[in-house]
Curated annotation (Swiss-Prot):
Organism, as annotated: Bos taurus (Bovine)
Homology family: Belongs to the ACTMAP family.
Residues at the active site: 129
GO molecular function: initiator methionyl aminopeptidase activity
Bias type Low complexity, positions: 34-48
PANTHER family recorded: ACTIN MATURATION PROTEASE (PTHR28631:SF1), UPF0692 PROTEIN C19ORF54 (PTHR28631)
Protein name, entry field: Actin maturation protease
Amino acid sequence: MISPCSPPLEPPVPPPETPASQALSIPLPPLPLNLPELAFPPSSFQASVPPPPPLPPPPRTTGFAPPHVFGLEKSQLLKEALERAGPAPGSREDVKRLLKLHKDRFRSDLQWILFCADLPSLIQEGPQCGLVALWMAGTLLAPPGGTPLERLVQVAMERGYTAQGEMFSVADMGRLAQEALGCQAEVLCGGLGGPNRDHVLQHIVAGHPLLIPYDEDFNHEPCQRRGHKAHWAVSAGVLLGVQHVPSLGYSEDPELPGLFHPVPGTPHQPPSLPEEGSPGAVYLLAKQGKSWHHQLWDYDQVRDSNLQLTDFSPSRAADGREYVVPAGGVRAGLCGQALLLRPQDSSH
């Protein structure tokens, strides 16, 4: 997460071997007191005694337990709970479920066009949300097979972008993406609104991913906490409310009347983008590292959350852990910024 992150686990130090002089011994059973009454002589009795059982393993040394990793237990519990809930749904099925769930939010005076690239899900280990979001985006950018998350973590640490997995700089995230994924990276400054808005929407309509820092609410949706809950998400889908759907290259959803999709493999005319002053006309489909599922966020809500990332969390500042924060702090590293990623051979 942009929130504090766990230091990498170190392999536990094996316990020292138990010297032979300290080996445990199992005493033989005591001889009966009245040997003459036995049917066999003492020598025969001793010969019939079975050999002692093997020695038990030496006790574990208690002084070399693995170091405590902040947040790991919580993230493991989250992963186990999500795994018990069942397999992660396919991307398209998950999006369809989400749209059905929220269909009452959509303005009835508009028709809706969905552009959405398939993104896998990955649950973060501790607060590595930015690197997890980059990994998800990388599946649309890197060669088949993608780039392992471990590689992203390794490069980020080697370059000094992170101490524990945290990423407080959009510029550093862009440099990491270029090196580790071999893609184009454009740092967007000045917020997601104004002249940047159409640029962002056209980027997603073209099927390219967008990395967004924002403040995370309890339900993972954007909120405004002045950067104290800074988090990362990736968006590769957008739902546009338009007055008219272009006639070329779109088909209506059979289950959701009024929703249209571009027909795969068919040229389609780009729609007219909703005006910025039109409320409830643009929604981003986003994923982040604490859920298997897509979320549907009002574009203006994301814009406003991204634009107020100004302060480093006081609880992080007091927790005694090391963080890599750029000169100028959270405001300089995250506020009003986002990262647009494209394959290396893509034109703008």
